[in-house]
Regions:
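A short amphipathic helical element positioned immediately N-terminal to and/or at the very start
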Residues: 1-9, 109
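Transmembrane helix-loop-helix hairpins at lipid-water interfaces of multipass membrane proteins
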Residues: 6, 12-69, 73, 146-151, ...
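An intracellular "coupling" helix at the cytosolic face of ABC transporter transmembrane type-1 domains
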Residues: 7-10, 95-99, 115-128, 132, ...
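Hydrophobic alpha-helical transmembrane segments of ABC transporter permease domains
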Residues: 17, 25-29, 54, 66, ...
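Short intracellular "coupling" helices and adjacent cytoplasmic loop segments at the cytosolic face
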Residues: 43-44, 79, 87-111, 115-117, ...
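Helix-loop-helix
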Residues: 44-51, 144-158, 228-302, 306-307
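ABC-type nucleotide-binding domain
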Residues: 325-576
Length: 576
């Protein structure tokens, strides 16, 4: 992760150097104050006092300039570092496969991208300003104390190690606790995201109370951990103040004895107390630095864990091999394919075999959890088969570069997802170079042209994030049109017409069949009516293929398909 600081090496060096320069000027302030008391006030020399006060103002002004310069460089380095790290993390996440995304979870990745990197940025900013300054002032104040009075300076030698034990002891104890607290924060964020995403379902089933209880339980665990860490961290300040105040009392006692015997002047005592106060201030800063850096290191470790996660699948740089002549007509071929998700106890698909020819329409039907989405997710290689082989257009799916495979296979997901922008910008996801004529052709096929024309701005009509200003059916038709803009060779509709009425659904299927070329269409649907005219229908039950054939044949040979069909049409044969 430190490589992201390479572009800011100059700032990372100059920030602590200017802070040390500021600290150097601060260390001379007590000596000047001692001179004012020992010489100016004792001799009633007003001119001497004014000159020394001018020196104090000059030291303060130069110190302020150094401090502002250091702040500028540290902020520039920290912000630049976090920006580079955030870009790298986002780019890495884009390369991760569905398996890794499923394992880590969306809420976890959002936390890494936002609060974790912000914490790293704050920690780095503080570190660059204080990691040299605070120790330098602590050691420098002790050295300067020896120049004032050796006997009194030994109090510093005793106080500083005691303070260090307190500060570093708290750090060692709290560092692992911060990691636990952050993990519990992830849990709270995950529950929040899940609840807000499914708020309609929660209210539809009157589950607000149970969701509140679940959130309060997770939030209570987080609160208790944060309080536990806070209680331990809060010990640092009183313990350090007790040690410092005892040291000041000792200084005053030793100073009074030394003054009585003529070993030091009263101004020297003031200088020593000032040095002790400087040590107190810097150790408080150092304690805060350690706490913040501990948090930042914990967050950095979590970000690094994501960066260390390698994609589970690799794509070749170029297309491998030629499609065998005997498979030239194949669009998709599954050969004894099984799929088990990472961490799952049982396979989601078992021993699936079929061949879809170019230009065919393939229906996929089955009950909830039967493996329909799992099957079609293997075609664009969102996941790799655990067993068996998946061939696309005559070649193994692993032979295709990512762009080539995703360009040949277009998927319309179950959940219609649109992005903030315009209708045009969303459609151009399919092909950024598509002309307006191509966009309108795709809209016509997707049965979306009429409602887009009815919009005041047509293709330039704004689309809110997630398509909130569109109905469910409109969003589904636009996502289908977006897939068609890319002119794929294989189109997968994963239950993506569920919000369409029967007439629009039928018109969509008719328009897809009329498209030129050999477009192979996979239609995943709960409606048997949507699949009646498919060239082949795959019937799934509990991850196994229990039927394969045309509609009429399956009614005779596949009890599962017959049951699905009967459950949908026994009350309304007019829908056949």
């Amino acid at each position: 992760m430190l490589t992201h600081l390479n572009g800011y090496k100059r700032e990372a060096v100059l920030a602590p150097l200017f802070k040390m320069l500021e600290a150097t000027f601060d260390l001379f302030v007590p000596l000047v104050m001692a001179d004012i008391v020992n010489v100016g006030i004792t001799a009633h020399d007003f001119h001497y006092i004014l000159v020394r006060c001018g020196i104090l103002l000059l030291l303060a002004a130069v110190g302020l300039a150094c401090s502002l310069t250091a702040q500028y460089f540290s902020a520039k380095a920290a912000v630049g570092y976090s920006t580079s790290l955030r870009h790298a993390l986002f780019e890495h996440i884009q390369r991760l496969g569905f398996t890794e995304m499923d394992t880590m979870g969306t809420s976890t990745l959002i936390t890494r991208m936002t609060s974790d990197i912000n914490q790293v940025q704050s920690g780095l900013n503080l570190f660059l300003r204080l990691f040299l300054r605070s120790p330098f002032v602590v050691v420098g104040a002790m050295v300067m104390a020896f120049t004032v009075n050796v006997r009194a300076a030994w109090i510093f030698v005793v106080a500083i190690p005691l303070l260090s034990v307190v500060v570093f002891g708290v750090m060692v104890i709290t560092n692992p606790l911060y990691k636990t607290a952050q993990a519990r924060l992830d849990r709270v964020l995950g529950l929040t995201r899940e609840n807000l995403t499914g708020v309609r379902v929660v209210r539809a089933f009157d589950k607000e109370k149970s969701e509140i209880d679940r959130f309060e339980s997770a939030n209570d665990l987080l609160t208790r951990m944060q309080l536990h860490v806070g209680h331990i961290s809060s010990l640092m300040s009183p313990l350090t103040y007790v040690i410092i105040n005892l040291a000041i009392v000792a200084l005053l006692y030793v100073g009074s004895i030394e003054i009585n015997v003529g070993g030091m002047a009263s101004g020297d005592v003031i200088a020593l107390v000032n040095y002790m106060n400087q040590i107190l201030v810097e150790l408080v800063k150092l304690a805060n630095l350690i706490v913040q850096v501990s948090k930042a290191l914990a967050c950095a470790g979590r970000v690094q864990a994501v960066l260390d996660t390698e994609p589970g699948m690799e794509f070749p740089a170029a297309l491998k091999g030629e499609a065998p002549a005997d498979k030239a007509g194949d669009a998709v071929r599954f050969d004894h394919v099984s799929l088990t998700y990472a961490g799952a106890g049982a396979p989601s698909l078992t021993d699936i075999s079929f061949t879809a020819k170019r230009g065919q329409t393939i229906g996929v039907i089955g009950g909830t959890g039967s493996g329909k989405s799992s099957l079609i997710n293997l075609i664009p290689r969102f996941y790799d088969a655990t067993e068996g082989t998946v061939e696309i257009l005559g070649r193994p799916a692993q032979a295709y570069p990512r762009a080539a495979l995703r360009g040949s296979v277009a998927v319309v997901m179950q959940k219609a997802q649109l992005f903030g922008g315009t209708i045009r910008s969303n459609l151009l996801w399919g092909n950024k170079n598509a002309a307006d004529a191509d966009l309108w052709a795709a809209l016509e096929t997707a049965q979306a042209a009429d409602f887009v024309r009815a919009k005041p701005l047509g293709l330039d009509e704004p689309v809110e994030q997630g398509g909130r200003n569109l109905s469910g059916g409109q969003k589904q038709r636009l996502t289908i049109a977006r897939a068609l803009v890319g002119k794929p060779e294989i189109l997968i509709l994963d239950d993506s017409a569920s919000a369409l009425d029967y007439a629009t659904d039928a018109a969509l299927r008719k328009a897809l069949a009329a498209l030129p070329g050999d477009l192979t269409v996979f239609i995943v649907s709960q409606r048997a009516a949507s699949l009646q005219h498919a060239d082949q229908i795959i019937v799934l039950d509990d991850g196994r293929m229990v039927g394969l054939g045309r509609h009429a044949d399956l009614l005779k040979t596949c009890p599962v398909y017959e049951e699905i069909y009967a459950s949908q049409f026994k009350k309304g044969d007019a829908q056949k």
